[in-house]
Amino acid sequence: MNYIYLISAALGLIGGVSGIDCGVKELKEYDFESIKGIHSVTTLKDTPPTQTNVTWYIGICDTISEKIDHCPKNSDLCGITSINLEKNSNKDAVVSEIVGFNTNLQKQYKPFTKDGDNNEDGITIVYKGANWGDNLVDAELRFVCASSSDKDKDLDKFQLHQWDDKRLKVSVKTKAACITDKKDKKKPDNKKDNKKGNDKDDNGESWGWFTWIFIFLVLFLSIYIVGGAWFQYSKGNAIDFQSALREVLENFVSLLKGLPSFVREIIEKFTGNSNRGEYSAV
C-alpha cells in the first residue's frame, strides 16, 4: 500500500461565518486569525483495482460551506471518503463516506506546555460525540507552537495521525498556537527605554506636586480674602474691596518673592548643605 499525504492550506474564505471560533476566551491568547480559512489534509490509499481518497477539511475561524461538495452545512470539520476508479484521478469518483463535526458541537480547549519528548507548547481542541449514522465519533485537533528552529515551509500544514471510524487525530505546527501577551509588547526592550519610562514617571510626579501647591495657594488666598472681609464687616466698618484686593496682591507678590529662599532653606536643612560661610566651628 502506498500512502501519499497531500496537505494544503486550501480554498481561502468560502462563504462561512463560524468554524473554529477564534473569538472564544480560550483562544484569546493565541493568533488563530493568522491562519484563518479552510485547510485540508488528504490521504490516498491503493485499493486495487481502485484508489481510496480520504480528505479532511478543517475550518479555522470559517465554517466549511456547502460549496465544498458533499460537506454538511455549518461544519467545523468535514471528512469525505471517495473511491477513485482511476488511480490519481478523481474523475467519476464515488463518495462512500461523509463525516461532519457541526460548529454547534460542544468543544473542549486543553492548553499544554512542555508536552512530549519535544517539550511542545500549544493547545488541543477536542470534539466529543458527533453523530455519524448510528455511531458517535470524536476528534482531536492539536495545534503546536512553532519554535525558532522550525522552517517556514513546514508550518501551517496539517497532518493526519489517526482515523479509524471512531476517532480523528490531526495536528499542525504553527506560530498561531504560540501564546502572545500584549503586555510584553509594551515592556521596554533596553535600558534606554527604561530610562525614558522613568523620566515620564518623574515628570508626572512633579506636575502632581505643582498642582497641589497651586491648590493650597488658591485656598489660602480665598480664606485670606473672605476672612479679612468678615473681620472688617464684624467691626462695623465699610469694606473697601479695592484696598483689600490691593493688599492681597501685595502680600501675594511678597509671598512669591520669598518662596524661592524659603524652599532653598528647607532643602538645605534636609540635605545638610547649609552654607556656613568660610568659618567652621572648632
From Swiss-Prot:
Name the UniProt record assigns to this protein: Autophagy-related protein 27
InterPro entries reported in the protein's UniProt record: Autophagy-rel_prot_27, Man6P_isomerase_rcpt-bd_dom_sf, MRH_dom
GO CC, one annotated term: phagophore assembly site membrane
Record field: transmembrane: 207-227
Role, per record: Effector of VPS34 phosphatidylinositol 3-phosphate kinase signaling. Regulates the cytoplasm to vacuole transport (Cvt) vesicle formation. Plays a role in ATG protein retrieval from the pre-autophagosomal structure (PAS) and is especially required for autophagy-dependent cycling of ATG9.
Membrane topology: Single-pass type I membrane protein; Single-pass membrane protein
SUPFAM superfamilies referenced in this protein's UniProt entry, alphabetically: Mannose 6-phosphate receptor domain
Location of this chain's protein in the cell: Cytoplasmic vesicle membrane; Golgi apparatus membrane; Mitochondrion membrane; Preautophagosomal structure membrane
Family recorded in the similarity comment: Belongs to the ATG27 family.
PROSITE patterns (UniProt xref): MRH
Gene: ATG27
Residue ranges that the UniProt entry lists as topological domain Lumenal: 20-206
